[in-house]
A protein has these predicted regions:
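Glycine-rich beta-alpha loop elements in corrinoid/cobalamin-binding modules
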Residues: 1-70
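Well-ordered, non-membrane alpha-helical segments in soluble/globular domains
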Residues: 1-3, 114-118, 148-161, 184-192, ...
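Surface-exposed amphipathic alpha-helices with a cationic face
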Residues: 2-10, 103, 162, 241-245
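Flexible glycine/acidic-rich beta-alpha junction loops that bind and position SAM and/or redox cofactors
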Residues: 20-26, 133-146, 179, 209-224, ...
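Catalytic cores of alpha/beta
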Residues: 24-33, 186-188, 260-276
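N-terminal pre-triad scaffold of radical SAM enzymes
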Residues: 70-105, 111-114, 118-126, 130-133, ...
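Conserved SAM/AdoMet-binding glycine-rich loop
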Residues: 122-251, 257-259
């Protein structure tokens, strides 16, 4: 291939990014893909030296970890030189909530000034981009003191973005901040007034539910509900979902299955919370626990560890997401006539997903979960061919 030929001529490959930690679990891929160095963490203070060493033909380290004390200051983070993917614009780095499964909370909180954000918006605008994704672990604490929202900073930020972009989205917000900022400041109302216009009438965002269990929340993410007590975490989640539903904010929510010390009562609590969220427009995506952050010494959760309650959570998430996915697609997404072919393809895809989901449910019911986990070959049932 061209890359292998270039490697023979001295090409060096340095990789990084948010998922760089995954290379540590598949070191065999380093040789397969010819990777010379993996940078795990914020790279601004190390990448120039690595590039210089590569250009000079010097030996490169296999792995570079950038710890919390070595992250760049805002002044050391350069403005982007070319258009970003999907119009992504960073507004801050770090997170103060301290969830034990998340590596971002290990890094200090730093806010980009509006002047720096505007320069990146201008780079994207010059490239013809008309949309923007504001990137942060929690957009609603931009400019905050601790976890206390700063309405003035947020309103100025969104007003600035709408000056350059027709549409915007949020990469992440926390559910506690959605509820608190609306209850205390009516901030979601005010932001909607700034954002919604002839070009945009909804916002997409990723949020983290992670678990419906108060017991687990207390152990692994005690500040996730702050400023509310963690004991009312399910109520915080439901109220935030209600606020987002009323304001046409569409969350893609994550759940984590297989958290350390997870028991049947925790999964039952998650199922009960999912029942409470049925009426709120959202996508809910379950994930298996991956050892990161303060829990990086724990074991991965694997398919072989699934039990009946895990399967019930997976099923409930799947049908919730399919049902609301159809609603979102028909009422909010790709409404322009020119997107009709794409919309039709998505409808066909959802129909396929529903058919395969029903087939999978039948297989588990007929064969039993244990046989499916062992990887027993699954032959289509007569009903699945209809």
């Amino acid at each position: 291939s061209e890359i292998r030929e270039a490697k023979r001529r001295g090409l060096k490959i340095i990789v990084g990014g948010p998922a760089a930690w995954q290379w540590l679990w598949r070191t065999d891929y380093w040789r397969e893909f010819g990777v010379d160095t993996v940078v795990d963490g914020e790279a601004e203070n190390v990448i120039v030296e690595l590039a210089e060493r590569a250009l000079n033909g010097e030996e490169l380290p296999l792995y570079v970890y950038v710890g919390p004390s070595d992250v760049p200051s805002i002044e050391e983070i350069p403005v982007i030189k070319g258009a970003s993917v999907n119009g992504l614009v960073e507004i801050m780095r770090g997170c103060p909530r301290g969830c034990r499964f998340c590596p971002v909370t290990l890094r200090p909180l730093r806010f980009y000034p509006l002047e720096k954000i505007e320069k990146e918006l201008q780079v994207n605008a010059r490239a013809g981009l008309k949309g923007c994704i504001l990137h942060s672990e929690d957009v609603l604490i931009y400019g905050a003191k601790g976890l206390e929202p700063n309405p003035d900073a947020l309103l100025k930020l969104h007003t600035l973005v709408k000056k350059y972009c027709r549409t915007l989205a949020w990469s992440h917000v926390t559910l506690a901040e959605v509820r608190y900022s609306q209850e205390r400041y009516r901030l979601i109302d005010k932001l909607a007034e700034v954002v919604y216009d002839e070009y945009q009438d909804w916002i997409g965002v990723e949020v983290g539910i992670e678990t419906g269990s108060v017991r687990l929340a207390r152990k692994i993410m005690p500040a996730k509900a702050a400023p509310y007590p963690v004991e009312i975490w399910p109520e915080v989640v439901e109220e935030a979902f209600a606020i987002m539903h009323d304001h046409r904010i569409v969350p893609a929510a994550t759940l984590i299955l297989g958290l350390p010390d997870e028991g049947e009562e925790d999964l039952t609590a998650t199922l009960e919370l999912l029942d409470r969220l049925e009426g709120y427009r959202s996508l809910i995506v379950p994930m298996f626990f991956v050892p990161l952050g303060a829990l990086k010494d724990r074991r991965w959760f694997l398919r072989e560890q699934l039990n009946e309650l895990h399967v019930e959570v997976l099923k409930k998430c799947m049908w919730h997401t399919v049902r609301w996915g159809e609603d979102i697609m028909s009422k909010l997404y790709l409404r322009d006539l020119r997107y009709a072919p794409v919309k039709m393809l998505l409808k066909l895809f959802l129909a396929y997903v529903k058919r395969k989901a029903r087939e999978a449910e039948r297989v588990v019911e007929e064969m039993g979960l244990e046989r499916v986990k062992r990887g027993v070959a699954i032959a289509p049932t007569p009903a699945s061919d209809q």
